[in-house]
Every structure is written in C-alpha cells, then in structure tokens.
C-alpha cells in the first residue's frame, strides 16, 4: 500500500493534476514540504497523549508528507526499506547512543 501511494505521489510530480494537494506541495517546493512534515510531526506527538484514533490519523498524515518529501528529494522508497532491513536484528547498547542519556 505504501508503495502504491508513493508511486502515485511520484506520478503527481511528473504529471500534475489540477487541484491536487500533492501538486500544491510540489509547486510550493521543499520549504513548504518541510514545514508540513514539521507540523505533522508535532501533531503526532500531541495526538499520542490523546486517543488512538487521533494518533492513527496524525501518523497517516505524517506518513503521507514523508512520502512527498522522499519524492521531492528523488529518494526511492526502496532505499528506506533497505535501510530498515540493514538495521533489523542489530542490538544497540544505550551507552553507544549519544542521544539516549536519561534511561
């Protein structure tokens, strides 16, 4: 499903459709896309404190905007899949992770 959505988003980039929100984002450019990713990320954090339906909705919005960002930067979805696979099963010690300092 994500692959299909990503392909549709890429298609909008090369074959604009009048009135499409995806086209609007591409027309406005990277800064607008990044702004939306930031907004949606914040909304996910807030929704996580509320009910699951709201959280699901916000994660869906964030996922869509991340796919638009990938398409804007011409990063294949396959690259993300490969990166996730490369991390699968790898153990990480908290002492090796500088960003984790309050466990």
Curated annotation (Swiss-Prot):
GO terms for cellular component: cytoplasm. Pfam families: PRA-PH (PF01503). Its main location: cytoplasm. GO terms for biological process: L-histidine biosynthetic process. Pathway: Amino-acid biosynthesis; L-histidine biosynthesis; L-histidine from 5-phospho-alpha-D-ribose 1-diphosphate: step 2/9. It catalyses: 1-(5-phospho-beta-D-ribosyl)-ATP + H2O = 1-(5-phospho-beta-D-ribosyl)-5'-AMP + diphosphate + H(+). Keywords: Amino-acid biosynthesis, ATP-binding, Cytoplasm, Histidine biosynthesis, Hydrolase, Nucleotide-binding. Residues 84-103 are annotated as: Disordered. GO terms for molecular function: ATP binding; phosphoribosyl-ATP diphosphatase activity. Belongs to the PRA-PH family. This is Phosphoribosyl-ATP pyrophosphatase. It comes from Listeria innocua serovar 6a (strain ATCC BAA-680 / CLIP 11262).
């Amino acid at each position: 499903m994500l692959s299909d959505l990503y392909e549709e988003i890429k298609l909008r980039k090369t074959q604009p459709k009048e009135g499409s929100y995806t086209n609007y984002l591409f027309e406005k450019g990277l800064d607008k896309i990044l702004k939306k990713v930031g907004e949606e990320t914040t909304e996910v954090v807030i929704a996580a404190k509320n009910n699951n339906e709201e959280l699901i909705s916000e994660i869906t919005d964030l996922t869509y905007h991340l796919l638009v960002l990938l398409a804007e930067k011409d990063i294949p979805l396959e690259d993300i899949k490969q990166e996730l696979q490369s991390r699968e099963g790898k153990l990480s010690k908290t002492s090796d992770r500088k960003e984790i300092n309050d466990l």
